[in-house]
Amino acid sequence: MYWVNGQRRNEVPIHDRSFQYGDGCFTTILTKEGQVQQWSSHKARLQACLDILHIPEPNWDRVWQGLQSMILPQEKAGLKIHISRGLGGRGYSPTQVSESIVTISAFAFPAHYQAWRDKGLAVGICQQRMGLNPLLAGHKHNNRLEQILLKREMDNAGWDDGVCLDINGKVIETTAANIFWCRDGTMFTPCLRHAGVAGVARRQILELAQQQEIPIVIDEFTLEDLLSAEEVFITNALLEVAPVTQIGQQRLTIGSMTRRFQESSNS
């Protein structure tokens, strides 16, 4: 059952432009004990993507009510907000499109995430490369084919996740998370000017680092930069913060900075 523009439905229309063209955006939200986490940040990110796609904003009060009605009664669970430009229009042209369509769905918290948070992940290095798209970089739009192909590659190779590089060999993210690493008391993360998704959890970590006066460098980095790290962790809204204990053949220890941010982001 889905929440669709204020109504409960079991299906979505085939003429929805998100189904036809991936014309929209989405976000995935963590709930804890029935409470929506980081809503203001999720809303801001959705609005930024809607603005770049020229999709009218929905009634956010109604969306909030929809979220509340869909929360699963579990210690941890997830909600997905999917916003489509709407129905209709001939071909790619959006000039004859109806109002935007907001769909909310609920799902159980991934069972393996807690083990990843506690013990860490082993990640590979994706051989396929991400393209450059500065117009849409940072936004979580509904076209995720690159991530699907990269995740398929890592699944077939037996890794938990994979480090994604762009066509110029710069580190961008993993297939499902943003990536941070630490060396000599300084934290590093890719800038995402040309590719990747700027996650809500990434934003939270950047804010926490600033509050705690931890030096952080946001720039373009090579794989060699990443492999010189003393500790590495990844973030997304559901997983929050999880340590990386292996990148390819290189082993890593779980560092104090990682545990510090796990504690800070969970408070």
UniProtKB/Swiss-Prot annotation:
Report the domain of life of the source organism.
Bacteria
Q: Which reaction does it catalyse?
A: 4-amino-4-deoxychorismate = 4-aminobenzoate + pyruvate + H(+)
- Give a single Pfam family match: Aminotran_4
- Report whether Lyase shows up as a keyword of the record: yes
Keywords on record: Folate biosynthesis, Lyase, Pyridoxal phosphate
Which GO BP terms, alphabetically? Answer: 4-aminobenzoate biosynthetic process; folic acid biosynthetic process; tetrahydrofolate biosynthetic process
Report the pathway entry: Cofactor biosynthesis; tetrahydrofolate biosynthesis; 4-aminobenzoate from chorismate: step 2/2
Location of N6-(pyridoxal phosphate)lysine modifications:
140
Family the entry assigns: Belongs to the class-IV pyridoxal-phosphate-dependent aminotransferase family.
Subunit description: Homodimer.
Q: What is this protein called?
A: Aminodeoxychorismate lyase
